[in-house]
Regions:
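A cross-family phosphate/adenosyl-ligand binding-site feature
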Residues: 1-121, 126-177
């Protein structure tokens, strides 16, 4: 994948941020990438990352400030500046919001704007209940026009039999349509 204008949404599943960050940094080497983060990603310190460190790495790789407000995300539609959107990781909550048309945070509003512009959205799911109550929304997204899923599997089938995580090493290959 080269010379693409990529909008890259980052949501919860904080334990997946390190793996997703590697893929983000690789995409930035040969593409124009703009990060858009959920409020929690932008503000929460977790056992996996201090938010300042995570944001700093995104901005260093992309050479752009992270979009992190509704006001900033609203500009995505009229600008029509992006070829594709990647949302990784996408939480089950964000999957539900997308299916139900709830655009109340930066990533979901940016995704709505991409759909308005007839652009594709590639998403990587990470959810402890992806094969349980959240399966309905995840599989609904998979069947909607303009949505493509990064292949996923159970991440701990004997300890967390309902948990699924996308194979982050297939992110770029999935997005390179």
């Amino acid at each position: 994948m080269k010379n693409q204008h990529i909008l890259f949404g980052i949501c919860g599943s904080f334990c997946n941020h390190a793996a997703v960050l590697k893929e983000f940094e690789k995409l930035c080497e040969e593409n124009d990438v703009q990060a858009v983060d959920s409020e929690n990603v932008f503000t929460c310190n977790t056992r996996f990352f201090q938010h300042e460190d995570f944001i700093s790495r995104l901005e260093k790789a992309s050479h752009k400030p992270v979009i992190h407000t509704i006001v900033e995300a609203e500009k995505v539609g009229p600008s029509n500046a992006y070829d594709i959107m990647i949302i990784a990781p996408m939480s089950a909550t964000v999957a539900a919001k997308m299916v139900l048309g709830i655009y109340d945070h930066p990533v979901t509003l940016a995704a709505k704007a991409m759909l308005r512009n007839n652009r594709n959205i590639v998403f990587g799911i990470a959810s402890n209940d992806g094969l349980s109550i959240s399966a309905k929304n995840i599989f609904t997204l998979i069947n909607l026009k303009h949505f493509f899923v990064i292949p996923f599997a159970q991440d701990a089938p004997f300890e967390k039999e309902r948990s699924i995580v996308s194979k982050w090493n297939l992110l770029e290959k999935t997005a390179d349509m």
